[in-house]
Amino acid sequence: MARKKIALIGAGQIGGTLAHLAGLKELGDVVLFDIADGVPQGKGLDIAESAPVDGFDAKYSGASDYSAIAGADVVIVTAGVPRKPGMSRDDLIGINLKVMEAVGTGIKTHAPNAFVICITNPLDAMVWALQKFSGLDPKKIVGMAGVLDSARFRHFLAEEFSVSVEDVTAFVLGGHGDDMVPLVRYSTVAGIPLPDLVKMGWTTQEKLDAMVERTRKGGGEIVNLLKTGSAFYAPAASAIAMAESYLKDKKRVLPCAAYLTGQYGVDGLFIGVPIVIGENGVERIVEVAFSAEEKAMFDKSVNSVKGLVEACKGINAALA
């Protein structure tokens, strides 16, 4: 049986962490690509030299030529500039749009059948542009956002309740920005919805609202602490969960930025919604019912993404 091939575009902090996790989880062989020659080769060699200690047999290679990603089963894109303190994800749009054009061309030429996961910010606009530049089937390209945002929410909830994170489910939809939509009534501890836990006296509505707000600002909190870049452990773990569901046909239900064709009243945009990821890529888009308040929050989030997509079209006429 041929081993799967995982191509990582961008060998920065997230790229290196992705490469390590892919090996530890035995997902396949890894090629790291980066325009900074030497960096992908060095990180690949370093991780390969950890394999005898950790007991995994993934093969690692590094490259600065897109031909190295040929035939990849999964491509995970982290290339671009990260946020610095004081920046929003949206401030990155001009620089990272140019990066998506180069990456999209590389994927189109060398790995047109891959399942592609985009992590580059501003996420919802970059995955939209990457699909346009690569010409990929929209079912084969998603953005990593909701898995990370939900994980942050789950962490805060587990800490508040002093319970295992495994027993906490959380639901964060919408764009990957400050207008994201953490859905409290669909989030649970051991199947008990959060509003019920408030009634049971486990927490207060004020504390719950504060955790929702902290989730929205979760990326910025880490940017402000690190001062030199943005989060990478949790984003990498989130993308690996998505890749694993595809490679192993697990059919996990995960919130991801997926291409909508009328669902949720949205057409032609990538927005964070629950999807089923299996061997065919995005196999189902799960449409949940919103309350009036949730719908208003979701629509606001969609409008933010629309604005970013329009900005992309303004920068690059080929996208219009």
From Swiss-Prot:
Family recorded in the similarity comment: Belongs to the LDH/MDH superfamily. MDH type 3 family.
GO biological process, one term: lactate metabolic process
Gene: mdh
Binding site for substrate: R83, R89, N121, R152
Keywords: NAD, Oxidoreductase, Tricarboxylic acid cycle
Organism (species): Methylobacterium nodulans (strain LMG 21967 / CNCM I-2342 / ORS 2060)
Record-linked HAMAP family: Malate_dehydrog_3
SUPFAM superfamilies: LDH C-terminal domain-like (SSF56327), NAD(P)-binding Rossmann-fold domains (SSF51735)
Purpose of the protein: Catalyzes the reversible oxidation of malate to oxaloacetate.
Record-given protein name: Malate dehydrogenase
NCBIfam families assigned to the protein according to its UniProt record, in alphabetical order: MalateDH_bact, PRK06223.1
Single Gene Ontology MF annotation: L-lactate dehydrogenase activity
Organism placement in taxonomy: Bacteria, Pseudomonadati, Pseudomonadota, Alphaproteobacteria, Hyphomicrobiales
Catalytic activity: (S)-malate + NAD(+) = oxaloacetate + NADH + H(+)
Superkingdom assignment: Bacteria
Residues annotated as catalytic: H176 (proton acceptor)
Amino acids binding NAD(+): G10, A11, G12, Q13, I14, G15, D34, N96, I119, T120, N121
Pfam families: Ldh_1_C, Ldh_1_N
Assigned EC number: 1.1.1.37
